[in-house]
Swiss-Prot record:
Domain HTH lysR-type: start-end pairs: 9-66
Family: Belongs to the LysR transcriptional regulatory family.
InterPro entries linked: LysR_subst-bd, MdcR_PBP2, Tscrpt_reg_HTH_LysR, WH-like_DNA-bd_sf, WH_DNA-bd_sf
PANTHER family cross-referenced by the UniProt entry: HCA OPERON TRANSCRIPTIONAL ACTIVATOR HCAR, TRANSCRIPTIONAL DUAL REGULATOR HCAR-RELATED
GO cellular component: protein-DNA complex
Record flagged with keyword Transcription regulation: yes
Provenance organism: Klebsiella pneumoniae
SUPFAM superfamilies, alphabetized: Periplasmic binding protein-like II (SSF53850), Winged helix' DNA-binding domain (SSF46785)
Domain of life (superkingdom): Bacteria
Keywords linked to the UniProt accession: DNA-binding, Transcription, Transcription regulation
Record-linked PROSITE patterns: HTH_LYSR
Record protein name field: Malonate utilization transcriptional regulator
Keyword DNA-binding among record annotations: yes
Pfam families xrefs: HTH_1, LysR_substrate
Length: 308
């Protein structure tokens, strides 16, 4: 399609023009649009040049619209209305601005972090609906990349998302502990050396979970492959198996408050100590999305509250 529209004709200038036609003079237009009178006059003058015919006539200090201006106004209203509908439809297809935010999270974050952030979000944007999806680190990241989620709360590595298409809001760091059945007679005052548990059975999260990666790394440092009885797809099932005496496991410290009476959590000895960095991640191209900006702000407030 051939484009014969002069580059001087912009949506911004059309907006100024429409406001001028409604207000009747430059001063009131400038006040309504929070612009200077000079900016309004320049916008109208360059728009007139772009259209290629007179739109106004000077009468004293006043600028009066000609019939051509009223004709242009009629079409401007149609164009702006059509463009607004087009932008709304575009955002809808992209999942933006529908009054709904699709958030993905690790299962372990539903105990405290996610509820607090959701409560804060409802205070900031009470009309916003929040859809929650739980899964592994890798599953949630794949869904974010496929635009099936708007933001995710996952474990991130330092520098992992540098120079990528994602923005990251760090929330907190969490230690990993050895989890043992409550019936085991262990000295909780001692740091847990994984080599002392080489003859024990373990339960683990499946591949793709953040804690699974730490599990593999810790036992690699310990120098042996643990006997894994079973792998599960959520951390609550893993804790239930530890409670039942099926085996030991490695758990993030954020589970401690809820399960410290049901399982024993021992701090790992120095060679095996590791920390998970929990962050909010979302696409950089959505950085100006008001809902995501609210989520990021709530995340920063949460981070400040627990890192004092």
């Amino acid at each position: 399609m051939k484009d014969d529209i002069n580059q001087e004709i912009t949506f911004r200038k059309l907006s100024v023009f429409m406001m001028f036609m409604a207000k009747g003079n430059i001063a009131r237009t400038a006040e309504a649009m929070k612009l200077s009178s000079v900016s309004v006059h320049r916008a109208l003058h360059t728009l007139e040049e772009g259209v290629g015919c007179p739109l106004f006539v000077h009468k004293g200090r006043n600028l009066l619209p000609l019939q051509a201006a009223w004709t242009l106004l009629e079409y401007c209203q149609d164009v702006i209305s059509l463009m607004n509908r087009g932008l709304e439809a575009t955002r809808k297809v992209a999942g933006v601005g529908q009054g709904r935010l699709r958030i993905g999270t690790l299962y372990s974050l539903t105990l405290e972090t996610v509820p607090r952030i959701i409560m804060g979000m409802k205070l900031r944007r009470p009309e916003l609906e929040l859809d929650l999806t739980m899964g592994s680190n890798q599953m949630l990241l794949d869904m974010l990349e496929d635009d099936a989620l708007d933001a995710i709360l996952i474990a991130t590595n330092e520098g992992e998302f540098n120079n990528t298409a994602f923005d990251v809001v760090p929330l907190f760091e969490d230690d990993i502990f050895l989890a043992a059945p409550a019936t085991e007679r262990l000295d909780a005052s001692r740091l847990a050396d994984l080599r002392d548990y080489a003859d024990r059975k373990f339960v683990s999260l499946a591949e793709g979970f953040a804690t699974y990666a730490g599990f593999r790394e810790a036992f690699h440092i310990a120098g042996f492959e643990p006997e894994i009885v079973t792998r599960v797809n959520d951390i609550f099932s893993m804790i239930s198996l530890v409670q039942a005496g099926v085996g030991f496991a490695l758990l993030p410290g954020r589970m401690k408050k809820v399960y410290e009476k049901d399982v024993q959590l021992l701090k790992l000895a120095e060679p095996y100590q590791m920390r998970q960095l929990i962050s909010i991640v979302y696409s950089h191209h959505r950085e100006r999305d008001a809902d995501l900006l609210a989520l990021a702000a709530e995340g920063r407030m949460y981070a400040r509250s627990i890192n004092r």
